[in-house]
Amino acid sequence: DTALITLDDVDAALGDQSSLTLDSLIDAVALGRVAAADQALTRLTAGGQTLQTALGAVRRHFQILHLATGLIESGTPQTQALSAFRPPLHFRRKPLVENQLRLWSRRKIERALALLHKSEIDARAMRAAGTRLPEAVAGQILLRIARAAQR
């Protein structure tokens, strides 16, 4: 009996599951998939990740979306603008990010970045005071951004 091995099987066996889950969260938020974002948040926290880490990862992604959007607005072809991502996008994520670029205007990205930046400043201030940004607050911020993608 021979079984077919899929790319998902390989990812599950070899991939860094925390980065896969973080990518799942980033893509769910940026695509406006609120339920999927909520599930990814649950998986991240169950795996020991802090949502402050997730906020930073989502912010970095939106910064690159902002850069790519600016390149596209100045006449750079979308495929070339996608090469601005560092590290380079995995081939499976390219279509997802292409969809994100269609969903997010420069202005919407700037609003999301302002919210993410403020939440990171608040988290740093709370950490300096010996407390942490409540996980629920960080999760609500990410879900709020996911809902904004739908508008």
Language-model-derived ranges and their functions:
Residues R43-L44, D122, R144:
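Amphipathic alpha-helical regulatory segments at dimerization interfaces
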Residues A129-R151:
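Acidic, carboxylate-rich catalytic segments that either coordinate divalent cations
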